[in-house]
Amino acid sequence: AIGPVDEV
């Protein structure tokens, strides 16, 4: 992922 959030 990219940025402060991550996809599970």
Curated annotation (Swiss-Prot):
A molecular function GO annotation: hydroquinone:oxygen oxidoreductase activity
Annotated coiled-coil segments of the chain: none
Main location class: secreted
EC number: 1.10.3.2
pH influence on activity: Optimum pH is 2.4. Stable at pH 7.2 and 5.2.
GO BP annotations, alphabetical order: lignin catabolic process
Catalytic activity, reaction form: 4 hydroquinone + O2 = 4 benzosemiquinone + 2 H2O
Entry annotated with the keyword Flavoprotein: no
Cofactor(s) recorded in Swiss-Prot or TrEMBL: Cu(2+)
Activity regulation, short description: Inhibited by Ca(2+), Fe(2+) and Al(3+).
UniProt temperature dependence: Optimum temperature is 20 degrees Celsius. Thermostable, maintains activity from 50 to 60 degrees Celsius.
UniProt-annotated location(s): Secreted
Keyword match Phosphoprotein: no
A Gene Ontology term for the protein's cellular component: extracellular space
UniProt keyword terms in alphabetical order: Lignin degradation, Oxidoreductase, Secreted
Cofactor note: Binds 4 Cu cations per monomer.
Similarity remark: Belongs to the multicopper oxidase family.
Other remarks on this protein: Inhibits cell proliferation of HepG2 hepatoma cell line with an IC(50) of 2.6 uM and L1210 mouse leukemia cell line with an IC(50)=3.2 uM respectively.
Function summary: Lignin degradation and detoxification of lignin-derived products. Exhibits broad substrate specificity against a range of aromatic compounds with highest activity against guaiacol. Shows lower activity against 4-methylcatechol, 4-hydroxyindole, catechol, hydroquinone and 2,6-dimethoxy-phenol.
Record-given protein name: Laccase
